Amino acid sequence: MNPQDSALQVRGLTKRFDRLAVDALDLTVRTGEFYALVGPNGAGKTTTLRMVAGLLRPDAGSVAVFGIDALSDPVAAKQMMAWVSDEPMIYDKLTPLEYLEFVAGLWGIDPATSEPAAHRLLASLGLEPHQHERCEGFSKGMRQKVALAGALVHDPRLIILDEPLTGLDAVSARHVKGLLGDRVRSGCTVIMTTHILEVAERMADRIGVIAAGRLVAEGTLAELRQENGHHDTSLEDLFIALVNVEAAAA
């Protein structure tokens, strides 16, 4: 697949810290799909997404976002993407509505456009009753939702999420999953890491399994089952089998 035909194309992505964290990883996410990246702790999931989002410079490899070289033209690439980590960073002294309007201003969005969009985002995440309260008193889950709303205010085409459901209660998780599903149905592309395999199983069009910095399996759930001889198993059992095989081969 050509870079122009995909939302995200990663080739040979490599990063070393004290050890090799990401090992010549190749990854393609198709336009309009929901892609879940799963793997054990320390597998390289977050490091991979941080390099894709332009927050960490790779030692080697390339990243293309809708055909744009994200390493040589990071400004153009970042205009098309949103990044939300599992540790939300927001301005605590602002209310959710003020924060979204502030972020919209950074993107140069006219208030006449940004204010209705901000109200819609807050309502979709169940934050409308709290839109005039300062964020400093919010739980981590509420802060996570404010951060997500802020990341989406410029209507990005590629949404990059690192454990977006961490710290959320069942109601908040449903809000987030509903919003992400709506975005994909409207043509956006989502790539996210998650340890909640049930979420990957239910929401993702395709799933990538990463272990020791390498993509060891990829496909729809049906394809993963067929390729690995686990025709009726859950993603959890399949994941454990794949990771154990990779560990034994290491």
Region spans (language model):
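Helix-to-loop junction immediately C-terminal to a conserved catalytic motif
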Residues: 53
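Conserved catalytic motifs of ABC-family nucleotide-binding domains
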Residues: 155
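Conserved ABC transporter NBD signature motif
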Residues: 61-72, 76-77
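ABC ATPase "signature
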Residues: 218-219
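Catalytic Walker B motif of ABC-type/P-loop ATPase nucleotide-binding domains
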Residues: 159-163
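Conserved ABC ATPase "signature" region
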Residues: 101, 105, 112-130
